[in-house]
């Protein structure tokens, strides 16, 4: 009995540890704070608390822990109460040597019943091990859902910010182009310009303004997606104030130091725990080849009247061991063992695949992120040079030192370069989130200026 109680105590402790692990995983990661965007941190925290997918994963983890506790309780004796009433007639023919008719009888019964399977074969312990591994896998699934959803929230948010930046670029360039149009109109009125220059300026301004509705729609779509991910029912509750600073882009981590981190990813750890559970289920299935030893018993009172129950003349009890063995059903046992081994083979393949895919995702995301940071530096230089060139072209045209084609070309190039810079920054930021996702939420970045 003491062995079974110790096993139950271990199961309860594991359940408490699982709840602690979930609570710890729900705290905001330093990674998000290091990015320097308070709105992003707020959205990530709200997602952890209110997202429905996370709530579903938490409910599954709770169910898995309850199943583990139930498996632990199977190791202990089961005591139940019973009370009942029957009316019976006994035929005299069923009692040899007795003649005559027996009158109908009332039988009142109340007492306790005991049943206990002694885990001689280890079947119950293997089942407990399997359920424990499944509970741990469910806890890792919660972490995986959290990492996946918070990464998705961050990617949507950063794409929204990118659309906002491109919208600002379009509006800023449209204002510059509107001033250029006014210059061409004044020159035309003064007899120093041409109608062709004015129409070209109008065409370029209209093309720039045409991009604004599309960007506004992209921003609204991003807000709607964030509303769903954060679990909000109303869009007006989702406040996204203007962001004055860009997200910090840290240096990419070194690949050589990340092999263990890959195996600590929640999806990989979940696959590993599922493999352990499948192995334990094989052991439980094989244990069915061995006999089962159980103890059963009952104690209570029986009488012809309810008020007689409890009197010294009405007690009864029964107790004894029972040994059972499926001697004529071993084919069924063999089939169950084969099925369990097939499940174990699937779980092993899933685990190996998860490790391989995790390594691929991590290596690809780190290389992509590093190259996107490098590309962003060039795009920023190109945008700055284009801004200077556009300003010089407008100045030379105003002073009569160049034709209008140079102004159009410089302004068109400026719009393209600033758009490319905004897109490049969004790509670098979302690639950073992809690295975080590939790391399974681990924060191994070193803060650095771009």
Which ranges hold each PLM region?
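Amphipathic alpha-helical coiled-coil scaffold segments and their short linker/junction regions
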Residues: 48, 130, 193, 197-207, ...
């Amino acid at each position: 009995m003491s062995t079974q109680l110790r096993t139950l105590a271990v199961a309860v402790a594991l359940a408490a540890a699982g709840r602690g692990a979930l609570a710890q995983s729900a705290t905001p990661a330093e990674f998000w704070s290091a990015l320097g965007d308070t709105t992003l941190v707020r959205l990530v925290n709200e997602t952890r608390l209110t997202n429905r997918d996370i709530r579903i994963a938490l409910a599954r983890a709770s169910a898995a822990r309850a199943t583990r506790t139930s498996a632990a309780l199977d190791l202990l004796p089961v005591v139940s109460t019973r009370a009942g009433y029957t009316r019976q007639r006994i035929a005299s023919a069923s009692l040899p040597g007795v003649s005559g008719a027996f009158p109908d009888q009332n039988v009142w019964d109340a007492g306790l019943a005991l049943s206990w399977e002694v885990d001689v074969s280890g079947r119950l312990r293997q089942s407990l091990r399997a359920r424990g591994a499944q509970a741990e896998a469910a806890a890792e699934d919660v972490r995986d859902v959290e990492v996946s959803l918070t990464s998705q929230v961050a990617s949507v948010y950063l794409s929204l910010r990118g659309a906002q930046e491109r919208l600002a670029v379009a509006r800023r360039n449209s204002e510059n182009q509107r001033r250029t149009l006014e210059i061409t109109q004044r020159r035309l009125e003064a007899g120093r310009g041409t109608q062709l220059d004015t129409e070209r300026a109008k065409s370029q301004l209209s093309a720039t303004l045409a991009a604004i509705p599309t960007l506004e729609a992209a921003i609204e779509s991003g807000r709607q997606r964030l509303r769903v991910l954060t679990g909000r029912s109303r869009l007006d509750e989702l406040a996204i104030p203007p962001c004055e600073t860009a997200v910090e882009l840290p240096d990419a981590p070194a690949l050589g130091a990340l092999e263990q981190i890959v195996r600590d990813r929640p999806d990989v750890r979940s696959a590993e725990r599922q493999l352990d559970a499948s192995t334990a289920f094989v052991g439980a299935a094989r244990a069915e080849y061995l006999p089962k030893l159980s103890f059963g018993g009952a104690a209570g009172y029986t009488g012809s009247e309810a008020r007689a129950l409890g009197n010294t003349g009405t007690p009864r009890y029964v107790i004894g061991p029972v040994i059972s063995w499926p001697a004529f059903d071993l084919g069924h046992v063999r089939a169950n063992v084969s099925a369990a081994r097939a499940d174990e083979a699937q779980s092993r393949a899933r685990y190996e695949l998860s490790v391989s895919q995790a390594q691929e995702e991590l290596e690809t995301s780190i290389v992509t992120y590093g190259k996107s940071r490098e590309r962003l530096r060039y795009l920023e230089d190109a945008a700055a040079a284009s801004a200077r060139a556009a300003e010089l072209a407008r100045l030379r045209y105003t002073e009569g030192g160049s034709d209008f084609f140079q102004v159009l070309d410089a302004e068109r190039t400026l719009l393209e370069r600033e758009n490319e810079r905004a897109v490049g920054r969004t790509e670098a930021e979302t690639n950073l989130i992809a690295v975080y996702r590939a790391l399974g939420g681990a924060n191994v970045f070193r803060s650095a200026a771009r």
